[in-house]
Amino acid sequence: MGVQLRLPPGEPCHEGYVLSLVCSNSSRASCEITNVSESLPYPVVYTNLNSSKTNFSISASVENKYNLYVGLVLAISSSVFIGSSFILKKKGLLQLADKGITRAGQGGHSYLKEWLWWAGLLSMGAGEAANFAAYAFAPATLVTPLGALSVLISAILSSYFLNERLNIHGKIGCILSVLGSTVMVIHAPQEGEVTSLHEMEMKLRDPGFVSFAVIISVISLVLILIVAPKKGQTNILVYIAICSLIGAFSVSSVKGLGIAIKELLERKPVYKDPLFFILLTMLALSVTTQINYLNKALDTFNTSLVTPIYYVFFTSMVVTCSAILFQEWYGMKAGDIIGTLSGFFTIINGIFLLHAFKNTNITWSELMSTAKKEALSPNGNQNSYVLLENADFSASGYDDDITLFSRTNDQSSHKL
């Protein structure tokens, strides 16, 4: 609910009644009452429609900030639960492997008897539920990029509980991801967006979003029917592009269903609205398609490449779809837009460092020793000696070179 109004005594309040409001710019607005429900205990009540003060904007700002904070807490909680779930399930699977039981990768199902695996599954469910609820309170522009924190949390916990080494690139990537997420939270849009299924329906009918949906659908069909059978096994971008394009619809559906659940808690007959079932069907189709092609990408290409590329493509499509559908960027200051984009690209760099160099064994002490060696040679001459000291020369290789040159000389002498 964006703005609350208390009508004067005797003023009718029923569906279909039209209110005439006087705006601050001397214009008039006609508002039709589309739904009547029980009053909720909001702390601010508006009693004067003609007040010259900015009560409307103040209350809307307070409510929007409240929703933003709730969505932020839910999004971070989702990342914590999902990141922890990978560790719990992996820990349970490792315990089964130590016992000599058939592993899941070999077709075994003994993990169903392991309580740690079930704890991980419940943690995953709690994280997905929190993420689902976060879209009902906060903009998708904020919720979706924060999903990168689950990767960060999983990487940190794995180094402590699974004894998996986190190199210097991974640590820098974690720091960049946290900094980028913080910047995005600070500059996130705080508009009220859509607060009811009726408003959601109006947004979906907007010509701009209809054009966007048609273009995305056509591109997705071309990729699925024509490009994927030919180039899917050789080009990593094909499967990831399909997942990302379809993923934009899944997030929009989740956003709409979250609003429907909020209205259902307010005892509104949401189940009578066809849009509820349309969103539910769209979510099922889009998620099924995403899972199918994401599994193909993971099965065909290296995970260290799929994860960061998929994050960039998917988040970019969600932000674009949200900007068109919910107009989350409308009214944002230039500084906030730059800050949001900067935070997003910082997260991208962090995720890239975390995955692309995860097999690179470089420690902080090695970097410091290299820096000290470089500092010893002001003219850069010491570097050549360091290279010579670290180079491995084999006697056999040296002999091969001599033999090669001698054969060359012999051949040249015969020619002469």
Swiss-Prot record:
PANTHER family: MAGNESIUM TRANSPORTER NIPA3, PTHR12570. Residues 89-114, 158-165, 229-233, 295-305, 358-416 are cytoplasmic. It is a multi-pass membrane protein. One of its GO terms (biological process) is magnesium ion transport. It is found in: Golgi apparatus membrane. It comes from Mus musculus (Mouse). Residues 1-67, 136, 187-207, 255-273, 327-336 are extracellular. SUPFAM superfamilies: Multidrug resistance efflux transporter EmrE (SSF103481). Keywords: Glycoprotein, Golgi apparatus, Ion transport, Magnesium, Membrane, Transmembrane, Transmembrane helix, Transport. This is Magnesium transporter NIPA3. It holds the Pfam family Mg_trans_NIPA.
